[in-house]
């Protein structure tokens, strides 16, 4: 498997900050939403426990996008 085929690893910290371990930068839910739209795979792990929290973060992205579109 080539490096480009591997999902990007995102770590979520207790302060709710999201860290892209591939680019060594903090990202936002909007950034992750853009990754979804581009078809870029990623996994989100809780930085403290190592638990896979990708599903809950994806749900949060959908929820926030629905709220922002409903507010218009």
What residue spans do the PLM features occupy?
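Active-site and channel-lining beta-strand-loop segments
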Residues: 15-20, 26
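Membrane-proximal intrinsically disordered regions of secretory-pathway and membrane-system proteins
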Residues: 2-4
């Amino acid at each position: 498997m080539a490096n480009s085929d591997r999902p990007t690893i995102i770590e979520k910290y207790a302060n709710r900050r999201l860290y892209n371990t591939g680019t060594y930068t903090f990202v936002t839910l909007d950034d992750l939403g853009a990754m979804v739209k581009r078809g870029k795979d990623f996994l989100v792990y809780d930085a403290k426990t190592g638990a896979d929290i990708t599903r809950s973060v994806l749900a949060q992205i959908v929820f926030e996008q629905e709220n922002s579109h409903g507010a218009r």
